Amino acid sequence: MLLHFILYAALSSVVTSVSLQPRLQDGLALTPQMGWNTYNHYSCSPNETIVQSNAQALVDLGLSSLGYRYVTTDCGWTVADRLPDGSLTWNDTLFPQGFPAMGDFLHDLGLLFGVYQDSGILLCGSPPNETGSLYHEEQDARTFASWNVDSLKYDNCYSDAATGYPNVNYAPSTSPEPRFANMSHALLQQNRTILFQICEWGISFPANWAPALGHSWRIGNDIIPDWRTIFRIINQAAPQTDVAGPGQWPDLDMLEVGNNIFSLPEEQTHFSLWAILKSPLIIGAALKDELTAINDASLAVLKQKDVIAFNQDALGKSASLRRRWTEEGYEVWSGPLSNGRTVAAVINWHNESKDLTLDLPDVGLQHAGTVKNIWDGTTARDVLTSYTATVAGHGTMLLELQNTTAVGVYPRGVFGVSSGQTTTFQNIYAVTTSAKYIISVYFSQPASSTETITIGSNANQSMISAQVPASSTLVSAEIPLTAGSSNTITINTSIPIDAIHVTPPNGTYYPCTNFTLAGSTTLTTCGSGYCQPVGSKVGYISPSGTAKATISATTSGSKYLEIDWINNDIAFDSSWGWGSNSRNLTVTVNSEDPVRIEVPLSGRHSELFGPGLGWWDTSTLGLLTSGWKEGLNEVVVGNVGGDEGFQSYGADFVGIRVLD
């Protein structure tokens, strides 16, 4: 009975099935790794003093005791030439005591020793040239083990032999997988278990192969010192959140908290999302050196124990995108935690403070005994259906919900008020306006004899009669509800009520093949089993291109749509600028104002070698549309405003389900 509620709450969960690789089974990274890395602040210019002072700060500032233990020296540590025996060595001007001594220093502090290398012939950041590990994997793995290294971050520069080993090649002639596999296998031959962090920049959809080789993998290109980078990165995370789990973590890149780039609310958003998406939490700021010390506000963000606990939760399940309101400038991500808890994040993309509401059904819930607002430091109790709070510009309402009731379930003791034989249930949620909701009334004791009860809602002027057979504890009926969270249901009966369950209509699906195309749009047949559930898609939706259909509705009002779309426009080169991993779509009903949604990536196959190059993988998001009337309605899927974005073409369109 609750299945359909779960389906419409988990709005981003509909994706083409992919056979994913099993994780590397070695007992490491059962929760995402935490630590500190030189790169974000010091680029490729680290030295021994920098690493040691920041490592000491991890301890002195209380960060290591919270889990930040891996200390990694990124690019800039080695030299152009190997030793006569072919082994790696360090730059002894920058690291006069040497890397083994650095490892001893870190281990004496109770920290873990991380090094950086590259799967190419040179390290990223060359020139000045620093030798890479390509063709030297076994020897370098032995060297790392002899230095008592605890983790290896393994990059992807200067690696494509077929094109002359360029610094960067986002479309290499072959998948990066074999190069990372070579180092993974070499590490596994050592007598020391080493955390392997794969840094392939999201090339060739590593979620399909990296979990079998390493403990984390970069989902995309580097984080950049600008607020827009957050939207770009989480759009790339969206289609692979279900892959996260013990020993296999999608890496959203190192943290910029403390680098004086973001405002405090922006840092809270950044840290919140990385935490609940189960990314490794690797500090990229200068904690303490001769010139710099992290500010207190940023340090407090990094030390927020609840947020760290979300990241390190034993269940190991990532949050996923649930709803996105593009024009209104906010969205909801949510996921499960251990002990039946739920974490939810409501992101305010606008740079001004506003009151935002989380409708609990959007995250699969109807009631929460407690709602803890992490960044506000407040707790609300007995929250029914909706929770509202003020969210700073670019900030996030981060919530922990406990003692919850599943969506669509309304216990009388929580939602009902009784007077005599009349019980009124309040705060009833309706995702769409429809006369086809099913109410199931559960009684706390069997009916002693056949009884006729009446049921009404504020969306219906007359009461509905339903007959309860003798000895029955359940009766169901069809009732109307209006989209929103303020519906009421009134029931008259002498039988004591335990709870009601409310189920929305299944709706009707309209495939893209039923739409009339205009302008630039084209209909394409996909490979067998792809572009689900239709097998075809409409593409090349320019700002003047449309797909139009006439759709019948049984009632007027606002209707909830589930739109199936495809987007694999990955921001590689464009990630340094305004690339966002998103594309635009609009839905217009009866010439009303279009409802716009900027959809994230959906691709779950390699953009270079996979079926359809990732452009056959469907995902789903929901949106509420207005302007519906009883009878026939003109529905237009288009790309209104697309010419104002970075990418003028919209996402590909597969179909829509209208909940009427």
From Swiss-Prot:
Binding site for substrate: 200-204
Upper lineage: Eukaryota, Fungi, Dikarya, Ascomycota, Pezizomycotina
InterPro entries on file: Aldolase_TIM (IPR013785), Glyco_hydro_27 (IPR002241), Glyco_hydro_b (IPR013780), Glycoside_hydrolase_SF (IPR017853), Melibiase_C (IPR041233)
Enzyme Commission number(s) from the entry: 3.2.1.22
Active site positions: 155, 222
Residue positions the entry lists as glycosylated: 47, 91, 129, 182, 191, 351, 403, 460, 492, 506, 514, 584
Keyword check for Signal: yes
Subcellular location, record wording: Secreted
UniProt main location, coarse: secreted
Physiological role: Hydrolyzes a variety of simple alpha-D-galactoside as well as more complex molecules such as oligosaccharides and polysaccharides.
Disulphide-bridged cysteine pairs: 124-157
UniProt GO MF annotations: alpha-galactosidase activity
Source superkingdom: Eukaryota
Cellular component GO terms, alphabetical: extracellular region
Name the record gives this protein: Probable alpha-galactosidase D
Source organism: Aspergillus niger (strain ATCC MYA-4892 / CBS 513.88 / FGSC A1513)
Keywords: Carbohydrate metabolism, Disulfide bond, Glycoprotein, Glycosidase, Hydrolase, Polysaccharide degradation, Secreted, Signal
Encoding gene per record: aglD
A Gene Ontology BP annotation from the UniProt entry: polysaccharide catabolic process
Entry similarity comment: Belongs to the glycosyl hydrolase 27 family.
Catalytic activity from the UniProt record: Hydrolysis of terminal, non-reducing alpha-D-galactose residues in alpha-D-galactosides, including galactose oligosaccharides, galactomannans and galactolipids
Keyword presence, Signal: yes
Signal peptide range: 1-20
Matches recorded under CDD domains: CBM35_galactosidase-like (cd04081), GH27 (cd14792)
